[in-house]
Structure formats: structure tokens, C-alpha cells
């Protein structure tokens, strides 16, 4: 390919709306262009990258025995209602684009395909003899992100590989889950990425267990917690750990404390000579349930700890046996809108009276009460007195009455001691999620009544797994992990081209002839080569070559008359002066050495 025919348009200035390096470089390098918020066009260079990633994914999926298919992007609402996900995905801040057809039938533009594939499996897979089966597809997905950002990292349209497996038993599901884990490790390794597999929350997809694959990068949206010995890694949403030990509060008689202008843990402790681990703080949250119910929740947690809202959502879902869409702190304005009397914010205790909710217009009229073990394990503590500007000291749970149900709700932090070995300390890293695998169990097959006949002749629901990779996100994550101040530095396996030839002076016939010779020889050797034949200054071409990040560069310049060229490796910046023949041989050998990563 010749640059003069590539429609390459590079930018010198950083686009104002691009916040992170990878987004900036993809725009500046002519790989993508923004069409509207969260929607991008993949230009020729980017499309070559995406095709290479796709081919690697297809090879590894096919090697597991998975079958490629293509499912409809438009999906009937009826399937999603049967699974219980329509309301959560379309109401309020739901992520699904949805519409009505001419007959008034509701449809959703697929953010994921569990419902459709489960329905098809129920029709097509009748007997245990047909199992296991894994189906996968690679296509565009759509999510109506509230705040699209970071380019392809969090867009409203993106390319994804999603696979779904169907099994006769849980043990068989576990085997496929392990096989997919291994396939994902190979995919990311072949793509030249450093990834970490971490325990993860299953989120809106659901299921018994899941694992995320993170590309480590400072700009990552996710916080990963990893043990020093490398034996434990989890997304912070999922992580568990031992909290720091509390500093005991000496037992004393219960007494009231006047605490004016001490409505935060910090101001209370400063004024009263306390430390946060001696205080039980109370958070009032509102849970939005999938059936439309609004449930006030009262959470007790030790004063030095932070609430993990994902853990709270999961705990509430188990407690209510219903899907919980989200939780958020209750505000004074919301209380007023419910026609309720003001609550004593900053001075609430675990025994806050349900009577405060008796006149609520649309909320459930009682608190659902939960407490983190960091709170329930305190023998003596300070807490709010349920009156403005007053707290209680010398309190115990027996003095308060009923102890709330104890469940892990705290957010693990770097510095916490590890569960598997308390001598190990959690460390934090940032990561970009590029893959996620789930053991779904029977959640969807039961909801959609997708069954097979087992070896005893009776009907039972499938055991299911699902396995996703963000193809377009992976491409940008590669840039985030592999770039420098001059531009991108693509791993060889997914680079749009393997070699770029830069002719310093296209008007020089000797340079042009030698460049054309190398171009033809490299093409004949099945090496993907880009020839910069533009009539531009050499400095412009060199800057563009650095920016677009092709792994190897041949510069044909003044030494062309001696048959010599510069061979430059983009990643190391190593420069060698070689004969054209030596440069050709070196490239053939180098690319052959990486043959296992090529498609």
C-alpha cells in the first residue's frame, strides 16, 4: 500500500475533546474520526488493526470448538421481559436503545445477546447428546452510555465478540469456562498485550462467577487490587480483604454527646478526640428495584471504611430475591418530595425509626437494614442519636436492640491484608477491561424455559456460560499500553502494516528506485509494507511514521547511492545502517520469528 493512496490525514494538534493519550493518538494518527457523541468511524488504518484482532480471536475461538454465527441486532422486547431485564435496560438510565416498529411492537438494539441465543438454543438443542455447544459472533453492539468518553473505551457503538455455551451439567460448564480462560490468555498474548485476570462482579449479565481480563494502563477506568505474591487479583468492585484493625473504644456507660457542626466523621472525631474506627456511620440509600419498587436502605459501616455500592446491590438482590437496578444516597430534597419530615443527617444511628417513612408517597414504608462486619464486630462505639447535633458514646449492639444482618459491604483498598494470606498486602493498579467471562448457571434458561432432554429422559434447563471480548476497545487499549511522546507503537501482530518505507526525497531518482525495489521484495516475501511516496518534507514523513506507529521503518535517504538504508525499530528506537539486502533479510527473519502471532 502507498501512503499517497491511503487517505491518510494526520493532525498536529491534540483534539480538545480527547482526554487520554490513546484517544488523542488515534484521532491524530488518522485511525478514527468522531461522527457524534460516542460514535466513531473506523478509517482504513484502524480497520486493518480491527481485522487482525478479529482474525486472532476467530482462530482461538475456532480452536476451542466454538461455532461462529451472526445474530440479529434488533431484538423483541418480549424476550427481554421474560428474562426480567427489559425494565432495567430501558427505564431511567438504562443502556438499551429501543424503538417501536410500524405495528407498535417494541424492539431493542442489542447491547448483548443472552436472550436471543437462549431462545434459539431452546428450539435447536433438544437432547443432551447435542451438548456441549458454544456459539460466538463478532459484530457491532449498541449501548446508550450516559457519558460517552475516552473514544472507543466507552462508546455508544462498538465491536464485540460474544460467545455463549450450553451444557448438560455444571461440571461441563466449568470445563468450557476454563478452556475460554485459556483461549483469552492466548488471544491477549498474541495481540502483544500485558493483561491481568481478576475476579469480577457479574453485574447486569448475572451468574454465579465471572472473571475480567484487564490491560494494565495508568488511564484505566478500573481499579485492580493485586496481592504482593500474585496469587489474588480482583476488580475493586469484587475484592475482599481484611480491614485495618480498629482502635478499641474503652467501654463506658452510654451517654449523649452534644455535637454541633460535627456532621461528618472527620469533624466529629476532631472535636471529640476520637478516631474513625471507633464510630459506626450510617448511610441511607434508595434502591431502585426492577419491578419499580423504591426501597430505602439503612447501612451501618465502620467510620474509617467506604461503602462498595456494587456489593450493596448484590446483597439487596439476594435479600429481596429481586433484581436491583441501582442504589444512590437519599437526599434532603428527595425526603421533602416524599412529604416527609426532615431527617437528622449527620446524626443518624443504626436504630433510626421506620416511622420516618410512614407517610412516604412512593417509597416502601420501612428501612431494609444491613451492616458491614466492620461495624457489627465493634464491642463499643459512637453512633448518631437520631437527633440533630447529637451522638451517643459507649454504645453496644445490645443497647441498640436488634443487630442488622451482617454482610460484606466495604470497599477493599490498597494496603488491606489479603484473605488467603494475612501477611500479604493488596496493591493497586489501573486497568482497562478488554474481556469478561461468566458462568451464568441457569438464570436465562430457566427464565426463557429453554430446556433439553437429559439422559434420564426428563426435561431440564441448560447450564450456560457467556464470554465477551471488546474488539474495538482492545485496539485502543493496545495504544494506551504501547505509546510514547511521539506516537503509537503497535505490537507487530495487530499493527496495520509491519514495515513502512520512508523516502526522504521522492524527487531523487536513486532513492525512489531503491525504495520501489525494497517495496516489491518485501511484498513478495508476504510482508505487509507501506510505502510513503508523498511529495512531502522528510521531517513531516518521519513525524507521521512515529505517530502512526508501524513497528519497523526503513528510511531511504542520502546513502541510497551506496545501496544503504536506515532500519529503525519503533519500540526501541534502535537505528542500524545496513545495505538494502541486509535490511530485507533482517526484516524477513524478525517477522518470521514472530510468526506464531501472525494470522
UniProtKB/Swiss-Prot annotation:
An example molecular function term from Gene Ontology annotations: ATP binding
Predominant subcellular localization, coarse grouping: cytoplasm
GO CC annotation terms, alphabetical: cytosol
CDD domains (alphabetical): ProRS-INS, ProRS_anticodon_short, ProRS_core_prok
SUPFAM superfamilies for this protein: Class II aaRS ABD-related, Class II aaRS and biotin synthetases, YbaK/ProRS associated domain
Subcellular location: Cytoplasm
Keyword terms: Aminoacyl-tRNA synthetase, ATP-binding, Cytoplasm, Ligase, Nucleotide-binding, Protein biosynthesis
PROSITE patterns: AA_TRNA_LIGASE_II
Catalytic function, reaction form: tRNA(Pro) + L-proline + ATP = L-prolyl-tRNA(Pro) + AMP + diphosphate
Record flagged with keyword Aminoacyl-tRNA synthetase: yes
InterPro entries listed in its UniProt record: aa-tRNA-synt_IIb, aa-tRNA-synth_II, aa-tRNA-synth_II/BPL/LPL, Anticodon-bd, Anticodon-bd_dom_sf, Pro-tRNA-ligase_IIa, Pro-tRNA-synth_IIa_bac-type, Pro-tRNA-Synthase_IIa_type1
EC number: 6.1.1.15
GO-annotated biological processes: prolyl-tRNA aminoacylation
Domain of life: Bacteria
HAMAP family: Pro_tRNA_synth_type1
Family classification: Belongs to the class-II aminoacyl-tRNA synthetase family. ProS type 1 subfamily.
Classification via PANTHER family: MITOCHONDRIAL RIBOSOME PROTEIN L39/PROLYL-TRNA LIGASE FAMILY MEMBER, PROLINE--TRNA LIGASE
Domains: entry comment: Consists of three domains: the N-terminal catalytic domain, the editing domain and the C-terminal anticodon-binding domain.
Function description: Catalyzes the attachment of proline to tRNA(Pro) in a two-step reaction: proline is first activated by ATP to form Pro-AMP and then transferred to the acceptor end of tRNA(Pro). As ProRS can inadvertently accommodate and process non-cognate amino acids such as alanine and cysteine, to avoid such errors it has two additional distinct editing activities against alanine. One activity is designated as 'pretransfer' editing and involves the tRNA(Pro)-independent hydrolysis of activated Ala-AMP.
Name of this protein: Proline--tRNA ligase
Organism per entry: Prochlorococcus marinus (strain MIT 9303)
Upper classification of the organism: Bacteria, Bacillati, Cyanobacteriota, Cyanophyceae, Synechococcales
Amino acid at each position: 500500500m502507498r501512503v499517497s493512496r491511503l487517505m491518510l490525514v494526520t493532525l498536529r494538534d491534540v483534539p480538545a475533546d480527547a482526554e487520554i493519550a490513546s484517544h488523542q493518538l488515534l484521532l491524530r494518527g488518522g485511525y478514527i474520526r468522531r461522527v457524534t457523541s460516542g460514535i466513531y468511524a473506523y478509517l482504513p488504518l484502524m480497520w486493518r488493526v480491527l481485522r487482525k484482532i478479529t482474525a486472532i480471536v476467530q482462530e482461538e475461538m475456532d480452536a476451542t470448538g466454538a461455532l461462529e454465527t451472526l445474530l440479529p441486532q434488533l431484538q423483541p422486547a418480549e424476550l427481554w421481559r421474560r428474562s426480567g431485564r427489559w425494565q432495567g435496560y430501558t427505564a431511567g438510565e438504562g443502556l438499551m436503545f429501543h424503538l417501536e416498529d410500524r405495528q407498535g411492537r417494541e424492539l431493542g438494539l442489542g447491547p448483548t445477546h443472552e436472550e436471543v441465543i437462549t431462545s434459539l438454543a431452546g428450539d435447536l438443542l433438544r437432547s443432551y447428546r447435542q451438548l456441549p455447544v458454544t456459539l460466538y459472533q463478532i459484530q457491532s453492539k449498541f449501548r446508550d452510555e450516559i457519558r460517552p468518553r475516552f473514544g472507543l473505551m466507552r462508546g455508544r457503538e462498538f465491536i464485540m465478540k460474544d460467545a455463549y455455551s450450553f451444557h448438560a451439567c455444571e461440571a461441563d460448564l466449568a470445563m468450557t469456562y476454563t478452556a475460554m480462560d485459556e483461549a483469552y490468555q492466548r488471544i491477549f498474548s498474541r495481540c502483544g498485550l500485558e493483561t491481568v485476570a481478576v475476579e469480577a462482579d457479574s453485574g447486569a449479565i448475572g451468574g454465579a462467577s465471572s472473571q475480567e481480563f484487564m490491560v494494565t494502563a495508568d488511564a484505566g477506568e478500573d481499579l485492580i487490587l493485586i496481592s504482593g505474591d500474585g496469587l489474588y487479583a480482583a476488580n475493586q468492585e469484587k475484592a475482599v480483604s481484611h480491614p485495618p484493625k480498629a482502635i478499641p473504644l474503652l467501654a463506658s456507660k452510654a451517654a449523649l454527646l452534644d455535637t454541633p457542626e460535627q456532621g461528618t466523621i472527620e469533624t466529629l472525631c476532631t472535636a471529640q478526640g476520637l478516631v474513625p474506627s471507633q464510630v459506626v456511620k450510617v448511610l441511607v440509600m434508595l434502591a431502585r428495584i426492577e419491578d419499580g419498587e423504591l426501597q430505602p436502605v439503612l447501612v451501618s459501616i465502620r467510620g474509617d471504611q467506604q461503602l462498595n455500592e456494587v456489593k450493596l446491590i448484590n446483597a439487596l438482590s439476594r435479600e429481596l430475591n429481586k433484581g436491583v437496578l441501582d442504589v444512590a444516597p437519599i437526599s434532603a430534597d428527595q425526603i421533602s418530595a416524599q412529604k416527609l419530615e426532615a431527617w437528622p443527617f449527620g446524626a443518624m444511628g443504626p436504630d433510626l425509626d421506620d416511622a420516618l417513612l410512614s407517610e412516604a408517597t412512593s417509597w416502601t414504608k420501612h428501612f431494609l437494614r444491613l451492616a458491614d462486619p466492620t461495624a457489627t464486630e465493634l464491642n463499643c462505639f459512637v453512633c448518631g442519636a437520631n437527633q440533630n447535633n447529637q451522638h451517643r458514646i459507649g454504645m453496644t449492639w445490645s443497647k441498640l436492640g436488634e443487630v442488622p444482618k451482617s454482610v460484606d459491604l466495604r470497599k477493599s483498598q490498597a494496603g488491606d491484608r489479603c484473605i488467603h494470606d494475612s501477611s500479604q498486602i493488596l496493591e493497586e493498579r489501573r486497568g482497562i477491561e478488554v474481556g469478561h467471562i461468566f458462568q451464568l448457571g441457569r438464570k436465562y434458561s430457566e427464565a426463557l424455559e429453554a430446556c433439553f432432554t437429559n439422559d434420564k429422559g426428563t426435561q431440564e434447563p441448560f447450564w450456560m456460560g457467556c464470554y465477551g471480548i471488546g474488539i474495538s476497545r482492545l485496539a485502543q487499549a493496545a495504544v494506551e499500553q504501547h505509546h510514547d511522546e511521539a506516537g503509537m507503537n503497535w505490537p507487530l501482530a495487530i499493527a496495520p502494516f509491519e514495515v513502512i518505507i520512508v523516502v526522504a526525497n521522492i524527487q531523487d531518482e536513486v532513492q525512489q528506485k531503491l525504495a520501489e525495489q525494497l517495496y516489491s521484495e518485501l511484498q513478495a516475501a508476504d510482508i505487509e509494507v507501506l510505502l510513503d511516496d508523498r511529495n512531502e518534507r522528510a521531517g513531516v514523513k518521519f513525524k507521521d511514521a512515529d505517530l502512526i506507529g508501524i513497528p519497523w521503518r526503513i528510511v531511504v535517504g542520502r546513502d541510497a547511492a551506496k545501496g544503504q538504508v536506515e532500519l529503525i525499530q519503533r519500540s526501541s528506537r534502535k537505528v542500524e545502517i545496513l545495505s538494502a539486502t541486509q535490511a530485507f533479510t533482517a526484516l524477513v527473519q524478525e517477522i518470521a520469528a514472530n510468526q506464531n502471532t501472525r494470522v
